[in-house]
Regions:
Chain A
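Ubiquitin-like/PB1-type beta-grasp interaction modules and other compact soluble beta-rich domains
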Residues: 1-87
């Protein structure tokens, strides 16, 4: 049996201007096992301070469904940060 | 909630062929087709647009388009739906989004088509960047509605 893990790995995706700020479209990160989407964003905002100004004008998704900021993450989840959509 | 398999829902990187989509949704039991053909305008807020680039969170965007199509069948008395959005670089005048809805009667087709484009613009994760002679900007968009925070336990995936 594998040892009990204290961290989980999730995939994070960036789109639009968020992708430009983060300089990447996706990456995998290890998080504490009770981490939620809000804390994941805070981690990126501390790494890329320019992101913080967009916190109130973006939404998140978890496993390709829109998700509230307090969604608790699980190993293997796919989280995306989505600017206001402008298709059409 | 899957759209009926007789619908066409897709994201494409090549030019959209409107005639084939319109022909596809047209059935002998129908009396009307309503089409929304969205294409690239040559200006934005008094600036001359050179071209646009669209990007999407592709698997989620396709799933959201399919949810919209499925909802149309539940909500309106329609026959078939075609909803196609193009991605990548688009030149002035090129179709970016094409929606065709067929129905026995026009009112349902109008209502469904209007609902489809309005909902697409508000909820499907697609983004457009506008290129001008002196730079580029991400287009203003709409923030999709998100289910409110809940303490419910999320089922394990």
């Amino acid at each position: 049996m594998p040892p009990v893990s204290q961290s989980i790995r999730v995939k994070v995706l960036f789109f639009g201007r968020l992708k430009e700020i983060a300089g990447r479209s996706h990456e995998s990160v290890d998080l504490a096992s009770e981490a939620d989407i809000e804390s994941l964003f805070a981690r990126y905002a501390s790494r890329y301070p320019e992101l913080q100004q967009y916190r109130s004008s973006l939404v998140a998704s978890c496993n390709q469904e829109f998700a509230p900021w307090n969604t608790v993450l699980h190993a293997g989840d796919e989280v995306a940060f989505l600017p206001p959509v402008s298709g059409g | 909630m899957a759209a009926p398999s007789t619908d066409i829902t897709s994201l494409v990187h090549e030019p959209i062929d409107p005639a084939s989509l319109a022909a596809y949704v047209r059935g002998n039991g129908d009396g009307a087709i309503v089409i929304f053909d969205g294409f690239v305008r040559d200006h934005s807020k008094n600036r001359r647009t050179l071209y646009l680039e669209y990007e999407a969170y592709e698997p989620m965007a396709l799933a959201k388009i399919q949810e919209i199509a499925a909802h149309l069948h539940n909500q309106f008395s329609i026959h078939r739906v075609a909803m196609v959005h193009r991605l990548g670089r688009l030149e002035i005048g090129e179709t970016s989004v094409y929606i065709a809805v067929s129905a026995a009667h026009r009112a349902a087709a109008f209502d469904a088509c209007r609902y489809a484009i309005d909902t697409l613009k508000r909820t499907v994760p697609i983004w457009k960047k506008e290129y001008f002679e002196d730079g580029s900007v991400w287009a203003d968009g709409e923030l999709p509605p998100v289910p409110s925070a809940t303490s419910a336990v999320k089922p394990a995936s």
